[in-house]
């Protein structure tokens, strides 16, 4: 009887130790999983922080250029950047045209209509650049989206690029963006100046590829 009792006690102890060992192992595995998750979350947090820092630097670069050329402007560099990324349009090209068209909304009729690129309306296939009854946008930022849609749907089509537009700024329907015969030459000059004076491309690449 004593032998049987000892055997039973031994089996119970062994069983308990196995259960305890399994619990310890599960706890260890859980701890390692939590540690790995923590490291992953810290990595994501750091990545997000870097992404924010890169975008802030890009915004600062764009705003600094705009403010230098047109101190009284009211347009948002961040709004321009976001729209350019959305429509995959060269930021420097957009800035160059905004500077040429209206001094970033501070010159000519654009100062009254807030139409930075002198595009008053766009419905997807037609653009009306004639301002009727003095109507315009409530804020310069509102003129960004119509301008982007106009470029993307009428000019930057059939493989045409921003570079092509600086050679001959004509839509697929044969419409010139501006009547000024030296428009492309002036646009390209400003574009090249922006390219030399800023680090927009590098900062944008850092932001998009972090």
Where are these regions (language model features)?
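Catalytic cores of secreted/periplasmic lytic hydrolases that degrade extracellular macromolecules
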Residues: 2-93, 99-210
């Amino acid at each position: 009887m004593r032998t049987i009792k000892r055997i039973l006690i031994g089996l119970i102890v062994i069983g308990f130790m196995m259960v305890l060992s399994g619990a310890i192992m599960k706890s260890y595995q859980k701890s390692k999983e939590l540690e790995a998750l923590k490291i992953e979350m810290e990595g994501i947090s750091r990545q997000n922080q870097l992404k924010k820092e890169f975008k802030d630097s890009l915004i600062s670069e764009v705003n600094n250029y705009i403010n230098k050329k047109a101190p009284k402007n009211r347009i948002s560099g961040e709004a321009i950047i976001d729209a350019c990324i959305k429509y995959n349009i060269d930021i420097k090209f957009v800035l160059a045209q905004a500077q040429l068209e209206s001094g970033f909304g501070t010159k000519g009729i654009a100062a009254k209509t807030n139409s930075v690129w002198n595009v008053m309306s766009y419905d997807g296939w037609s653009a009306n650049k004639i301002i009727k009854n003095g109507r315009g946008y409530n804020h310069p930022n509102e003129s960004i989206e119509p301008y982007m849609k106009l470029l993307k749907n009428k000019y930057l089509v059939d493989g045409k690029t921003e570079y092509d537009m600086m050679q001959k700024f004509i839509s697929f329907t044969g419409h010139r963006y501006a009547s000024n015969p030296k428009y492309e030459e002036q646009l390209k000059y400003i574009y090249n100046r922006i390219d030399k004076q800023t680090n927009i491309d590098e900062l944008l690449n850092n932001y998009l590829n972090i």
